[in-house]
Amino acid sequence: MIIVTNTAKITKGNGHKLIERFNKVGKVETMPGFLGLEVLLTQNTVDYDEVTISTRWNAKEDFQGWTKSAAFKDAHSHQGGMPEYILDNKIAYYDVKVVRMPMAAAQ
């Protein structure tokens, strides 16, 4: 399993604009190997908002299949370029080495 994060630096007070874009079912949910998505808002930033989109995939090839799909291109086609509220972004890839799940409570 891999996790891919896209961390965006957003003009202060506008993080909700990016978050709202992910608060609906999209086409990524239908992609082979897609395991889930979380949208994270960093707490206590002073000068800007920071939003991280974290996606989980069975394999890097599955993520690459998403980025090459027509659905990805459609979802990321910004008329006139990147939205003005996004100041910067960084993509990172993580190999998941350990996963721990909650244990059932003792009866």
Swiss-Prot record:
- Provide the binding site for heme: 76
Q: Could you say which residues are annotated as the site Transition state stabilizer?
A: 66
Give its localization: Cytoplasm
Superkingdom of origin: Bacteria
Keywords, sorted A to Z: Cytoplasm, Heme, Iron, Metal-binding, Monooxygenase, Oxidoreductase
Family stated for the protein in its record: Belongs to the antibiotic biosynthesis monooxygenase family. Heme-degrading monooxygenase IsdG subfamily.
Function recorded in the entry: Allows bacterial pathogens to use the host heme as an iron source. Catalyzes the oxidative degradation of the heme macrocyclic porphyrin ring to the biliverdin in the presence of a suitable electron donor such as ascorbate or NADPH--cytochrome P450 reductase, with subsequent release of free iron.
Name assigned to this protein = Heme-degrading monooxygenase
